[in-house]
Amino acid sequence: MKLHEYEAKELFSKYGVKIPPGRVATTPEEVRKIAEEIGGPVVLKAQVVVAGRGKAGGIKVAKTPEEAYELATKMFGMNIKGLVVKKIYVTKYVEVEREMYLSLIIDRATRRYLFLASPIGGVDIEEIAKTQPEKIKRVYVDPSVGLRDYHVRSIVLWLGFKPETPQWRQASSIVQAMYNIMVDYDAELVESNPLAVTREGDVIPLDARVIVDDNALYKHPELEKALEEDPRDVSEFEMYAKKIGFHYVELDGDVGIIGNGAGLTMATMDLVYHFGGRPANFLDIGGGASRDVVKEALKVLLRHPRVKVIFMNIFGGITRADEVAAGVEAALAEEGGTKKKIVVRMKGTNEELGRQMLAKLGIPLYENAEEAAQKAVELARA
């Protein structure tokens, strides 16, 4: 789950980090009111969970409440990388002396947390890595040991702060807060870009990003509720799949994919790519899928406007072919049939019974996965 900037900054504030005054608005009138309350110049930030908002016109500075109102009327409804602007974060404009970069991620290769710090901020860390890799410091933290003072000192020194000054203490507290957020909220990313030193001498995060592991959302009901109220970059189909309990990822192709097991599903996607097609999704119904799970999974793709063909690749170990066929039958019955072509390759437990059930629906069963994938791609092109 990707948090909006205002949500991420609320977390930072909760952990004692100073942030500029600001609130989120859903109408131009609210934007004007917040700007009046803040006083002076304000920054309007479109709340969409994608990078590059500024280049797309999603970040503007307003000197007066009226200017903020006018800018907001244009900003609401903007499409930024496929996401529509429905919220604007209005925050006090801050003059800065310098900008830095600081993030915390999970390094899966070493199974440790990894801080990335650079005295250069406000630009993509990937760009810094390409042009000035020597400017990036990597500090690994073993989760079994936790964050220690020597970790913090190493990071803060690299960012250019003098020991035991007020700025040193502020920067140190930000490092500690980011680590605590990472651990407490099961995050995959905690980032401030830029982390800034203001004209007043404060160290504050001008921007903040937090991504929480979707598999840990059950531990954070307030975030689950926020995601339900505002799906952000999660499609309606992904939200539905999450509620039903199977794994679904939205892609940009037109061949719908259903498999049982992550490995088989990814291999099925590879086959579609191999024959020149483009998968519309990743959908894993898991092992031992019941009739109802298959039914709900198929309904997602039957309703998806971009899906032209549905390719089901099922290996029946603990998953029974007749249960899968029954799920297909139930989905078509509930949806009143479909004009979309369904291609099925199914092997294993109760395979013959499943074949007979699908034959009654006019759906042929393919023996070979390559042949089935090729047929699915051909039908999508037709």
Swiss-Prot record:
Ranges of residues in domain ATP-grasp: 9-240
Annotated binding of ATP, by residue: 45, 52-54, 94, 99
Pathway assigned in UniProt: Carbohydrate metabolism; tricarboxylic acid cycle; succinate from succinyl-CoA (ligase route): step 1/1
Domain of life per record: Archaea
A Gene Ontology cellular-component term: succinate-CoA ligase complex
Catalytic activity, reaction form: succinate + ATP + CoA = succinyl-CoA + ADP + phosphate; GTP + succinate + CoA = succinyl-CoA + GDP + phosphate
GO annotation terms (biological process): succinyl-CoA metabolic process; tricarboxylic acid cycle
Binding-site positions, substrate: 260, 317-319
Any single Pfam family the record assigns to this protein: ATP-grasp_2
Alphabetical UniProt keywords: ATP-binding, Ligase, Magnesium, Metal-binding, Nucleotide-binding, Tricarboxylic acid cycle
UniProt remark on cofactor binding: Binds 1 Mg(2+) ion per subunit.
Protein residues bound to Mg(2+): 193, 207
EC number: 6.2.1.5
Assembly mode: Heterotetramer of two alpha and two beta subunits.
Family named by the database record: Belongs to the succinate/malate CoA ligase beta subunit family.
Protein name (database record): Succinate--CoA ligase [ADP-forming] subunit beta
